[in-house]
């Protein structure tokens, strides 16, 4: 019987070398496949999954897309994108702007307006006769009759809030004084007074004077005032005039 290999020892070494080379080639192919999976997009769950190799994140682009998707779904209303490395934080949800007119404000104290409120339907708003008139005309809310050499408190049925730092001076109207001898008394309205404005009218004429509802009876002038502190001293500085009083500066 003729043997298959005339030299068995040589055949054994040849087959062993061939098998070792095949195993090395297979191992190298597997390593190259694993490296390709780690660096490339990677196959779907196939050979890599079968060998227990976890599928890696595909790329930075897909990572950013996933983050943006999560921010859209998980934080509805978030405006802006995720911050870049080394950049400032991304802005939070936008807050609607609040109009200055709707913000809480402290209560106004005074101001440059002369404010008024009507206390009845008989009241008339103060008016000025011209753009540069010094006073605001005040109107009677009711009918009155003032006998000669008598007086009456004429109600206007308005209350006023004077400009800050002012008091109200109630002055007579020139027409009533010149034609009917009607004068005004007690004509000071304090800045903090909030009652019904009443005007004291004096009739210095010889006939009774009729006041009708809606008649102009006086004028209100807003004048600046200073509120000094009171200080008591032992003696005051002397002046050239001294205590000279009535008529001390001349006869006419």
UniProtKB/Swiss-Prot annotation:
InterPro entries: dUTPase, dUTPase-like, dUTPase-like_sf, dUTPase_trimeric. One of its GO terms (cellular component) is extracellular exosome. The modification Phosphoserine is found at residues 88, 99. Residues 78-104 are annotated as: Disordered. Keywords: Diabetes mellitus, Disease variant, Hydrolase, Magnesium, Mitochondrion, Nucleotide metabolism, Nucleus, Phosphoprotein, Transit peptide. It holds the Pfam family dUTPase. Changing residue 99 to A: Loss of phosphorylation. Phosphorylation in mature T-cells occurs in a cell cycle-dependent manner. Isoform 3 is not phosphorylated. Signal peptide: none annotated. Phosphorylation is necessary for activity. Found in a variety of tissues. Isoform 3 expression is constitutive, while isoform 2 expression correlates with the onset of DNA replication (at protein level). Isoform 2 degradation coincides with the cessation of nuclear DNA replication (at protein level). Residues 1-69 form a transit peptide. One of its GO terms (molecular function) is signaling receptor inhibitor activity. It is linked to Bone marrow failure and diabetes mellitus syndrome: A form of bone marrow failure syndrome, a heterogeneous group of life-threatening disorders characterized by hematopoietic defects in association with a range of variable extra-hematopoietic manifestations. BMFDMS is an autosomal recessive form characterized by various degrees of bone marrow failure, ranging from dyserythropoiesis to bone marrow aplasia, with onset in infancy or early childhood, and non-autoimmune insulin-dependent diabetes mellitus appearing in the first or second decades. Each trimer binds three substrate molecules. The ligands are bound between subunits, and for each substrate molecule, residues from adjacent subunits contribute to the binding interactions. Homotrimer. This is Deoxyuridine 5'-triphosphate nucleotidohydrolase, mitochondrial. It comes from Homo sapiens (Human). The gene is DUT.
């Amino acid at each position: 019987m003729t043997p298959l290999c005339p030299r068995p020892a040589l055949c054994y070494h040849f087959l062993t070398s061939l098998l070792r080379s095949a195993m090395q080639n297979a191992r190298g192919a597997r390593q190259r496949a694993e490296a390709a999976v780690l660096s490339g997009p990677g196959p779907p769950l196939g050979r890599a999954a079968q060998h227990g190799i976890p599928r890696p994140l595909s790329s930075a682009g897909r990572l950013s897309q996933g983050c943006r998707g999560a921010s859209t779904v998980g934080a509805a209303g978030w405006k802006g994108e995720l911050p870049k490395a080394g950049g400032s934080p991304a802005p939070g949800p936008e807050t609607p702007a609040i109009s200055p007119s709707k913000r809480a404000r402290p209560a106004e104290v005074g101001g440059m307006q002369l404010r008024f409120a009507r206390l009845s339907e008989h009241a008339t708003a103060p008016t000025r006769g011209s753009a540069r008139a010094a006073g605001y005309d005040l109107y009677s809310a009711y009918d009155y009759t003032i006998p000669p050499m008598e007086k009456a408190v004429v109600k206007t049925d308005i209350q006023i809030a004077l400009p800050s730092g002012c008091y109200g001076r109630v002055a007579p109207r020139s027409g009533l004084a010149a034609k009917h001898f009607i004068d005004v008394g007690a004509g000071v309205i304090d800045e903090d007074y909030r009652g019904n404005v009443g005007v004291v009218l004096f009739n210095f004429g010889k006939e009774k004077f009729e006041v009708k509802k809606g008649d102009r009876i006086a004028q209100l002038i807003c004048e600046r005032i200073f509120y000094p502190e009171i200080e008591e001293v032992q003696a005051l500085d002397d002046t050239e005039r001294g205590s000279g009083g009535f008529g001390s500066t001349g006869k006419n």
